Amino acid sequence: MVFSLKESSDSISKPSSLKNSTIIENPEILNNNNNNNNSNNIIKSPNFLLSQKQRSINISNEQTQRELNNNGGNLDHRDPNSPKYLTSSHSSVVIPQDNSNNNNNNNIRISTSPILTEISENGLLESPTSPIRTSSTPTTPTSPPFITSPPFITSPKGLNSPRRLVGFFSKSTSYQSLLANNNNNNNNSNNSNNNSNSSNSNISCSNNSNKISRLINNSNTTDSNASIRSSNNNNDDFDNNDDEDLNSINNSSGIGIGVSSDYSLMGSSSSINGNTTTTTTNTYSYNDNDNVNEYSPKGKRLIRHEKSKSSPPLSPITPYYENLVIKGNYTNSNNYNNYNNYYYNNNSSGNNNNNNNNNNNNNNNNNNNNNNNNNNNNNNNNISGNSGYNNSRDDLFKRPFEMNKESSPTNSLIPNVSALKLNRVIKSSNGSTIFTSTSSDIASENDNNKNNENENENENENENENENENDNDSDSENENENDNSIGNKSNKSNSELSIEEQEKKKEKDLENYINMINNSGFITNDSNNNNNNNNSGNNNSFISNGSPFSPIKEESPQPSPTFSPKPTLQRQRSNSKNVLYSPNASPSNSCKIPTPPLLHNISIIDTSNNNNNNSNNIENQNNNNNNIDNNIDNNIDSIDKKLKNNNNNNNNNNNNNNNNNNNNNNNNNNNNNNNNNNNNDDDDDDNNIKKTPNNKINTNENPMIITNSVLKRSGNIDYLQINNNYVIPSPSPGTQLSECTNQQMKYNPPVSIVDFTLIEKIGEGGFGQVFLAKKKDTGEIVAIKRMSKELIWSKNKVSHIKNERDILAQGKNHRWIVSLVYSFQDDQYLYLAMEYVPGGDLRSLLSALNSLDEDSARFYMAEMVEAVDSCHRLGYCHRDLKPENFLISRDGHVKLADFGLSKNVVTRYHLRSASADNTINTTTSTPTTSSNINQLSSSMIEHTPMKFGAAANGNGPLNSSVTDFGSFKDLSVAARLAYSVVGSPFYMAPEVLQATRGYGDEVDWWSLGCMFYEFIFGVPPFDGDSPEEVMETVLKWKTMLQRPDGVSDELWDLISGLINDGSTRLGSGEKGVENIKNHIFFNGVPWGKLHDLDPPFVPLLQGDYDTTYFENTEKLDNNFLLQQTQQLSLLPPPLPPPPQTPTQPQQPSLPPQTPNDKMIFDKIRSPVVYTNTHSGNIITSRSRPRNILGFTYPRADDQPLLWNNNNNNNNNNNNNNNNLLKNFEELTILNNNNNKNKNKGNSNNNNNNNNNNNNNNNNNNNNNNNNNNNNNSNNNKNNSNNKTVTIPISTGRLLNEIDNCNNNNNNDENNINTGNLTPPNSSPFNSGENLNFEKQEPTSPYGSYSKQQQ
């Protein structure tokens, strides 16, 4: 998928190696010599407007022609002696030669991008011999000569499709505010970074920066005394006089270049002296005396940067304010004061700290109304204060102007660690915790004086309306009136108060606030201090569902560019997803800090017991006279009792809570003969520490309902836990408790291609095509990758397809990897139904923009590092990293795809295991044997790659950071390295090309370094006209890799660290990816929270079926699927199943038991066939030779492999026994005559109820408890010789022929014994034997298919 601009073959040519690069030109100017007298020719593109104004640089064709003629020499870029030899691949703009004799101003307009903030810092456009010219007359703003419209864009095939790139050039205002805090440009575009409720919230100090015209020019220096409104002026001037300010700058500076306020201002040098701003501008001009040579260093830099600026930016990035404001210090202290007030509150100057006496008023009210026991107005109005921040030192985020450029390479907001310290938590006298944000929150409660007066009036009215008034009421009224008058007299504007007075005022208010809390009846245990008659017009301390909320009233914060005005625990993200915020965790760069969390705001109601006999009923709203802490204790006690006192008639009473007593786990069911005593539960300790109960997900018929909390699924944060008043996100979805544990597992029929409606073909590869499809029954929109079995088997790529299927199947647990939805097969094709990623890929983005600025590139680089690390953690080396394989999701984030060349390996990571038995010591010199490796659980291998200090066979230390195994789960084979020469030549590491010494996952980091280079400069570091030339250049990388100009030291250090020897490359070694994440270029990047950031580019989609960002799409007619079905019908029928005798039992015949308790596998009777080792020991079906066993997905949840056969055909009521058992290693088959279950655990099985409880991992699978008085009649058979045979799981599963049924789409021919589909309520043999599994099956099924070592 490539986007390019219109090309003129007669005027501009491109190097052969840059066929995907874009060139901007004006055909009208180049081809029409009669219309070149006008020096203000403007390129217009009416069909595709990117912005209203845009800078451009004029290059004279006459001057260019003279420079080319003076150069001489061989200009062939293929000639090594030519000066173009080393620069042809790094230039996408070739200055054309004009053979016209007309010397008029025939100009080439190259639309430039304002992404690069300081182009002139390295003298990139500086002419060494050009004299300095000073403009004497200013250019009128009515005719700016350099403002041009963007070029007209077409597809490579000439089809005009301006809509196709509309998403690439849309300004991502949310990311702009993230990097530069330019809030005034973001409030009109539904951006969640601006959470203010005020209509004036779009006013910020960044308007000043937008009005300072920072223009880059070469030889003209003009100092203008243009007066820029300083921050102590009225804010409305900045909001209404944008064009006036801009025009005044243009008129005074003598430059006819207009800069739109929508874009960042480029490279100015500005300083504020009092109220006057001096703007220094430089103007580049090219005249007849300029001697800039195309092949000189200056000319090369000019060409390179003209190329990088030839397309509009991703988003306007404002520059640093190092000259405008240095660490928030103005030369004028009054200006600094007013600027702080203006920036943080967005109110008129002098109305910020006028409401500081309200706390004193309420303090007096709370101290004089101690004997009123009404449950009316139970609220302390002014404890929490306002969440708006008036002092930048207390801000939870540092502003861009408060950071040095060295300390934060990005223009993003970073967390202020000092503002997150524990001194923000105030401890009362009885140990209660009250959250306060800053002293400024305490100081400012309301927006203006009128709000104070209205509230005080309402308080006096409410006080007079109280039913139980006494003498203290009148006293409190008088004191309120006095305090109100004092507050009105003491209200002063910020302009009249000095900094010292404000600090003293804040300290005093903080003392009053603390005294108010200590004297408040809500905090102390004194029964006489029940402040239930607080004079407030709003009663926010109410009781809902029996759970008292915090007495702290949370006011809506003042308009602030950073903080959300919503006083709940829920905040809004830019992608409109709800995320719970944890105050004890450092926020990410784009977090909006909500107000402090409510105390104990979770109420749990047990709907299973309608009759609540608890004397401490929390729903009684007449107990407001008691202390709030006592109410909380009662709430905890009542919840504990409700958790313990379940219905005695419940047939499935399985209480396995670790926080409850053992005795409470005993079910008091008289009809239940099976009491499950969990010996691993801990007793409750009675101590003075008050614990808040965790929210347990009860899966009984009457579950516990969580109320008073906003609980939505968002990302990997699904459930809410409360611990010490902190909202803590729950673990990842893979470790969460299933919500349908006691529900019957649904058996989904196998999926085939006829279940989908193919909509459009969106891609085509070497093995097949990719279609956009919709599932007919569920409406799921997926991308189906259809691959030909004939091609796969002929090219011996079966193992590659297996690896791709395994990685995609685990993608649901990794947000950086495209996840698999379905996988199935027929006789002709393999199908992978993946999630549809509609944003295209990074190659399309680079083709449209040609290059990225460092700030935008940093975002994509960080996400690419996370994606590659996720692949390595799964135990795979990608080996084919390129921009085409990084897809852009609908929310703008990156996902890694196309794992067709991935190699299943075990990378050198630290083994993070909680069990010491499963940990391999990598520091000792003793070799790790294969037997020790086999002791590792499959889940560790799958999700936590292992680290080896020696080869698996004990022959010595490894020569690489990756050990490759022939089968991903077969760890008993000897470790070896990868030797295949695969990948794209532009991004291929030298060790892959040599392929004699082997390589590991460090080759992926080399590929990332090459892509980072291409992000900045538009071309890969190693280029050539043919793959052979590219490979030769890669092998000579030490001499061919040169540092271009215009790249920062931090970025080049990162690139050179990745494009390096494998032994010293970043990402290799003991620390691995941590060395990359800790690099100075990624300072300030919130690793682990990148999805909270707003990406630079978000696709503009018109619907779920939008394929705008995919090229060469093809709509499918209605007969396409019918034709495919007819082709399948013409195939020869599958092989018939082997003959079966009628008297043959339906249970497998067990061979003699070996001394090692392992059964010799009968290959003659096997329904499967192993392929050779070169195909990865793939298992296929005998009946269908090209059917790959284990390919069908999903398997773990929806389509069971094995069933727990506790019930037989005569017992169909017990449907809870159909749960899939996972993570098993061995299979124990018990004969029919056995009425006891042999378990390694300590579970109690009474009255032959066949409760298969695995207690090895302290997990009680109590879903299989049959709570009735009827014993299983099938288990009451004759008790004769009990025989137990232990079979390896791979052999046992193959012997039972289960996978041959489930993994071949459950075809009738696959079931050898019956010829029919195995019913879900019984085992495939339906003979009544008891199958007990001790460990779970791995997510990747190939671990059980490893060839047995006999």
Swiss-Prot record:
Compositionally biased tracts (Polar residues): 84-98, 211-222, 431-443, 565-592, 1314-1330, 1338-1350
Transmembrane segments: none
Keywords from the UniProt entry: ATP-binding, Kinase, Nucleotide-binding, Phosphoprotein, Serine/threonine-protein kinase, Transferase
Superkingdom assignment: Eukaryota
Assigned GO CC terms: microtubule organizing center
Residue sites binding ATP per the record: 762-770, 785
UniProt record, GO biological process: intracellular signal transduction
Residue stretches of biased makeup (Pro residues): 1131-1142
Name by which UniProt lists this protein: Probable serine/threonine-protein kinase DDB_G0278845
Organism of origin: Dictyostelium discoideum
